[in-house]
Amino acid sequence: MAARLLVRSQLDHVEAGGILDDCGPSSSACASSWVLGKEITAAEGIAAKEKATGFKEKQGVSDNGSSLWDLIKTCKVLGANARYPRDWDDCVASLKKGAALIINVDAAKNYPPQAISAWHKRYIGRHAGATYGHMTAAAWCDDHGLQFADPTFSGKGKEKFAVTVTDKELKAIASSKGDAPFKRCIIVKK
């Protein structure tokens, strides 16, 4: 597969009271779009999570952060399949077979410079040194290698596509919560 991973931005949705919602369903839309080869918007991801979990999120309130299990169910509603990996090697091998990952991170801890969005740079300006629980996506192709998509990217201009990262950088990002990197991932496939 020779394609670039399109970001599904959570920024098009409500940010209220200092809370930016919808990273999980936006990342589910990104990963599912990749493996299914079709356009799935962040809004469709949000609707799929509501259908999968039965919970309608109140925007601007930290009331429904996504779990990886929620996102496995969300991907199923979107038409993809998702599972927990056996280990990090399973994550990498699956990526190289056309799967995508959803990765639960402590943003933007361990991010390389190219993976930090303009939104996050502004956020850090207001909250120096702060990190936050966050869902992201990753994929791999022959032409671009590993690609990392943070839904705080705008999805426009230079933030339209995921950024290229090395194997070491992706593993560091996935390790940002302090445990084994595969424990914070799900593998999304057809």
Report each predicted region and the residues it spans:
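Active-site-adjacent structural segments surrounding the nucleophilic cysteine of cysteine proteases
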Residues: 1-65, 116, 129, 156-162, ...
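Structural recognition of the beta-strand scaffold that forms the well-ordered cores
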Residues: 83-84, 101-105, 137, 147-149
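Sec/Tat-exported extracytoplasmic proteins
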Residues: 27, 31, 35-36, 75-79, ...
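Solvent-exposed loop/turn segments at secondary-structure junctions
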Residues: 18-21, 30, 88-89, 107-111, ...
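Surface-exposed ligand/attachment interfaces on beta-rich extracellular proteins
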Residues: 87-95
